[in-house]
Each structure stands twice: as C-alpha cells, then as structure tokens.
Amino acid sequence: MSNILTEICATKARHVADKKKHISETDLYNLTKNQTAPRGFRAALDKKRAEGKFSLIAEIKKASPSKGLIRPDFEPILHARSYQEGGAACLSVLTDQPYFQGHEDYLIAARNEVTLPVLRKDFMIDPWQVTEARAIGADAILIIVAALEDNQMQEIEAAALEYGMDALIEVHSTQEMERALRLKSRLIGVNNRDLRDFSVSFDRTYELIKQAPKECTFVAESGIQTHDDLVAMNQHNIGCFLVGETLMRQKDVKQATRDLLGLN
C-alpha cells in the first residue's frame, strides 16, 4: 500500500469509528428503506457499450491530495445535470472530506437531480460504510484492492450485493487483478495513475485487460484527457472510462463532456 493510501485509510478508520458512536448500523439500515432501488450502475455502462457508444463515469470532484482545489465554483447539482446532458452513463461523487473536500450531501444532491446511477467514491474499509452509502442513495461503491485484505474485500462486497448495489473493484497490478477476480463482482477498474508517485500510464491498463475475463466490464480510470485517449483505448477493447479532473476544470462542463465523448 502506498504511503498516501495508508494515511488515508488510517484517517478513514478513525472517522468511521467516530461515526459509529453517533449512529448504529440498525438505524442506518432503516434509512436504506427510504431509498429507491439501486439504479443499476454496471447495467448502465453495458447499455451504452451495447449501443456502440463510449461509457463514461463522470466524476464530481472538488479537490484531490495531489492537485489541491480543482473546482473553486463547485456546484454538485449543476455538475450532475451537465454530465447527464453531456452524455455520461453514470456519475461518481467524492464523499471523502479530509483529502478530497467531498461530502455525503454532494452525492444526495447530485442523485436527486438526475436519473443516472451514482457511485460513492470513497475509501471503503468497513461494511458499515456500505450501509451508509445505500442510506444516502448510492447505487455503487468502490473497493480498492490495494487498501484491503481479501476477507475485508469479501465482506464489503457481500454487503453491497445484499443491497443490490454494484461494486467497482479497482486494481493497479497483476497481483491485484488476481485478487479481484476471486470476488463475485465483474466490474473491474484500472487506475492509470500510480498512487506511489501519481504518474500516469495507459500501458498498465492495456496489460491488465488481457487478464480480465470476457464477461468483465472493464473501466479505465484517471489521467484521461481527450477524445483521442478514448479512441486509443477502444483499440484495446476498453470502452468504459472514469473521468473527473479533466472535466471539472472546464468552464462548460456539459460541452466538455460532449467533446470528450465525440458527440459534436
């Protein structure tokens, strides 16, 4: 595990422990009953691909540890609407506060504004967080293989599947891909950014997709900037992408989304 990931997970563990003191899992579970059914995150990605289109998970992201503040005029509702109108298949919303200036309220607001499925982008270390994710309306959660032991991944995935949610399993290496494929989920993401030094390379993604069974929905994450990047990856049978910073830095987010997808 990288130093930054170790630090983030340690901070997350403290925050989750503190949250548990204030609300029980039973109370959280009762809140999940007030939510509409999960919208089908992976299904939405697969549908776009079946239509011969690129599948975009568009990320609502205010800041990051490596880049600092990304979007000063941060408006989750407006960004969600722009992404949907721009042609995104799904949304991803950062809810981590200390490192990404995210918040659960951003996900709630974004999901209420659109009909797209929404991923809770956070560092999941405890099944309790999955219940919390469903309680705020998330349709999918992220599992970062580098951050967890196998038994932790299995418990978190099981909690997500029990709620009818999808789990996006993020890997960075051959070894992590092998571990990911022991899980039930077949929604696999490869982070093009090396968390050790934040460098970006698509080569890792091109190699790892060779390990993925054909039934997997394979998502390329991070460092994607142009429509040409999508075209290049499509030549390697990669048609699903998670993009945040590139779009969040643009004045016209809707138009930037359309440009990225080649819809103009």
Curated annotation (Swiss-Prot):
It catalyses: 1-(2-carboxyphenylamino)-1-deoxy-D-ribulose 5-phosphate + H(+) = (1S,2R)-1-C-(indol-3-yl)glycerol 3-phosphate + CO2 + H2O. Pathway: Amino-acid biosynthesis; L-tryptophan biosynthesis; L-tryptophan from chorismate: step 4/5. It is an enzyme of class 4 (lyase). Pfam families: IGPS (PF00218). GO terms for biological process: L-tryptophan biosynthetic process. The keyword Lyase applies. One of its GO terms (molecular function) is indole-3-glycerol-phosphate synthase activity. Its EC number is 4.1.1.48. The keyword Transcription regulation does not apply. Keywords: Amino-acid biosynthesis, Aromatic amino acid biosynthesis, Decarboxylase, Lyase, Tryptophan biosynthesis. Belongs to the TrpC family. This is Indole-3-glycerol phosphate synthase. It comes from Zymomonas mobilis subsp. pomaceae (strain ATCC 29192 / DSM 22645 / JCM 10191 / CCUG 17912 / NBRC 13757 / NCIMB 11200 / NRRL B-4491 / Barker I). The lineage of its organism: Bacteria, Pseudomonadati, Pseudomonadota, Alphaproteobacteria, Sphingomonadales. The gene is trpC.
